[in-house]
A protein has these predicted regions:
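Expand to "…catalyze enediolate/carbanion chemistry for C-C bond making/breaking, isomerization
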Residues: 1-307
């Protein structure tokens, strides 16, 4: 926990919190895993107080749709206050802002001096908006977007104009609304949903973006959530939005790399590099059959996920 007790902090006004900002700066996230992305409400101080020790690989502090307009400033100051008193965190920390023209510009400017890892801008539509967000954002932070408009869905590949733009998060319900399609389509095996997820994933990978799959909002239905995670892993996803610790545990388990995969990848890497030094790039291996360069590259991809 960041603070041993919240009793005094809960009594502070917004201005009093600003006056008591600390000067701590957490170190940059370096674990390299992004299996789970848990959304937190910054109006709940108990949740913010645990930012230093959560199981989620990524934690997103949400200033957008879950916060009423009358409380957005309070939520923004809460985020800054806890960040300013935090020395370290197990998680990659993201702040999800409102759209640029609905307060997002001001939120980014306010937060730039605090220590976190990325800003996630909502309702992005155009390359111009991405360019503006990058211009507003401090150079040491990544840019993420919520991919929830038909414009972004149709032009995602053209939006990556800078390496600091690293991640797109698909908001399936908002996207369906933007496309004029009903939310009832979100069912396992629906071909339209499969197409949307597949297109999103391939568009991300083709331009070097990490794609995070959608949030399953029936958070008590862990069986259905696990089924979605397994299907998305089969499709090629490596990251899933989460509501609460139960979903985080499932996502971390399913999107993790198991020991058998790691052992296989290490063996293939060592065997290929040994044969390669002898000028042989295709050979039969006693344990895993035929190994050539594409299989070697896949093994490197598995091992890269452990960095």
């Amino acid at each position: 926990m960041i603070f041993p007790n919240l009793e005094a902090i809960e009594k502070l006004s917004i201005d009093e919190k600003i006056a008591q900002f600390g000067n701590k700066r957490k170190v940059k996230y370096s674990r390299g895993q992004y299996r789970s992305n848990m959304m937190l409400n910054p109006l709940r101080l108990k949740h913010l107080n645990r930012l230093d020790n959560l199981e989620a690989d990524t934690v997103t502090l949400n200033l957008e749709d879950a916060i009423a307009p009358s409380r957005k400033r309070e939520a923004l100051v809460n985020i800054a206050f806890f960040l300013s008193h935090m020395e370290a965190s197990n998680s990659f920390l993201v702040v999800r802002t409102n759209p640029l023209n609905e307060g997002g510009r001001q939120e980014i400017a306010f937060l730039n001096d605090f220590a976190f890892d990325a800003i996630r801008v909502s309702k992005i539509k155009t390359q111009k908006e991405v360019q503006e967000a990058l211009g507003l954002l401090a150079k040491d932070k990544e840019l993420h977007i919520s991919m929830e408009t038909k414009e972004a869905f149709n032009n995602l590949q053209s939006l990556r104009i800078d390496e600091r733009f690293t991640t797109a998060n698909i908001g399936i319900l908002d996207l369906l609304n933007s496309l004029g399609l009903p939310q009832s389509l979100v069912q396992m095996g629906n071909p339209t949903i499969d197409y949307i997820l597949s297109k999103f994933l391939i568009d991300c990978h083709s331009v070097g973006l990490q794609g995070t799959s959608f949030m399953f909002q029936e958070y008590q239905n862990t069986q259905a959530f696990e089924a979605w995670c397994k299907r998305e892993k089969m499709m090629g996803f490596k990251s899933k939005a989460c509501m609460g610790p139960l979903q985080v545990e499932i996502a971390n388990r399913i999107f993790g790399v198991d020991e058998a995969q790691i052992e296989r990848a290490k063996h293939i890497k060592e065997a290929f590099e040994t044969h390669s030094r002898e000028g042989e790039h295709g050979f039969m291996d006693e344990r895993y059959g035929f190994i050539d360069e594409p299989i070697y590259k896949d093994a490197l991809l598995v091992l890269k996920g452990l960095e």
